[in-house]
């Protein structure tokens, strides 16, 4: 009686070829500033900081892209709160950094050291001999 299973297992190359052609499913989050961030579908529950504001990957509006040439499927999920977390207890530094005062002297010279032109020629002869 013949075995119902073939003597050789089916080639895995066909499955690998199909997996390579399959588009990567990703999630798009549209931020209030106008930027768009893309995340892998399996990347959920993580946060990121963009332009000083913290965002969650489970944002209010997200889109799932199913393939290269397919139109996106838009989904508006009900908001569970703000996607931007701003804790009022944390002191935020001023985003504008103060610039150093401009000096009148040359920035390339150190005022405590004498100019190299003022050093005697005998010093240089002694130094390099």
Swiss-Prot record:
SS bond list: none
Positions annotated as zinc finger (unnamed): 33-50
Q: What's a GO cellular component annotated to this UniProt protein?
A: host cell cytoplasm
**Where is the segment annotated Transactivation?**
115-129
How does it associate, per the subunit comment? Monomer. Homodimer. Homooligomer. Self-interaction correlates with nuclear localization and efficient activation of transcription. Monomers suppress local silencing by interacting with and inactivating host adenosine kinase 2 (ADK2) in the cytoplasm. Interacts with and inhibits host SNF1 kinase. Binds to ssDNA.
Give a short account of what the protein does. Strong activator of the late viral genes promoters. Enhances the expression of the capsid protein and nuclear shuttle protein. Acts as a suppressor of RNA-mediated gene silencing, also known as post-transcriptional gene silencing (PTGS), a mechanism of plant viral defense that limits the accumulation of viral RNAs. Suppresses the host RNA silencing by inhibiting adenosine kinase 2 (ADK2), a kinase involved in a general methylation pathway.
Per the record, the major location class is host cell
Tell me any Pfam family this protein matches: Gemini_AL2
Q: Which protein, by its recorded name, is this?
A: Transcriptional activator protein
**UniProt biased composition (Low complexity):** 1-12
Family affiliation: Belongs to the geminiviridae transcriptional activator protein family.
Q: What is known of its domains?
A: The zinc finger and the transactivation region are involved in PTGS suppression.
The record's keywords, sorted A to Z, are: Activator, DNA-binding, Host cytoplasm, Host nucleus, Host-virus interaction, Inhibition of host innate immune response by virus, Metal-binding, Phosphoprotein, Suppressor of RNA silencing, Viral immunoevasion, Zinc, Zinc-finger
Output compositional bias ranges, type Basic residues: 13-23
Q: Which GO terms describe its molecular function?
A: DNA binding; structural molecule activity; zinc ion binding
Annotated stretches, region: Disordered: 1-23, 73-117
Q: Quick check: keyword Nucleotidyltransferase in the entry?
A: no
* Compositional bias ranges of the Polar residues kind: 99-109
List GO BP terms, alphabetically.
symbiont-mediated suppression of host innate immune response
Q: Where in the cell is it found?
A: Host nucleus; Host cytoplasm
- State the span of motif (Nuclear localization signal): 13-28
Describe PTMs of this protein. Phosphorylated.
